């Protein structure tokens, strides 16, 4: 499965009313550039996960990426 843009993920989320947004993993990855730096990268294929997208967050250590998923579970 590949990381897609947030817009594409929200489109999938709206198409499946039973889906919800959930963190894909608990890791934090240092922010590099923009979301396009992460779009297209391969991630583990997990049953029930419809899409994965990158989201920018910030804490006291600086900006980081959090991978979010659209899931049916």
PLM regions and their residue ranges:
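Acidic, low-complexity, intrinsically disordered interaction modules
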Residues: 15-73
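Short loop/edge segments at beta-strand edges and connector loops
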Residues: 5
């Amino acid at each position: 499965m590949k990381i897609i843009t947030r817009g594409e993920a929200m489109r999938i989320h709206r198409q499946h009313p039973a889906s919800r947004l959930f963190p894909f993993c608990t890791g934090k990855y240092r922010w590099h550039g923009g979301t396009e730096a992460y779009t297209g990268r391969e991630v583990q294929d997990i049953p029930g996960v419809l899409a994965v997208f990158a989201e920018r967050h910030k804490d006291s250590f600086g900006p980081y990426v959090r991978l979010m998923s659209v899931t049916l579970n």
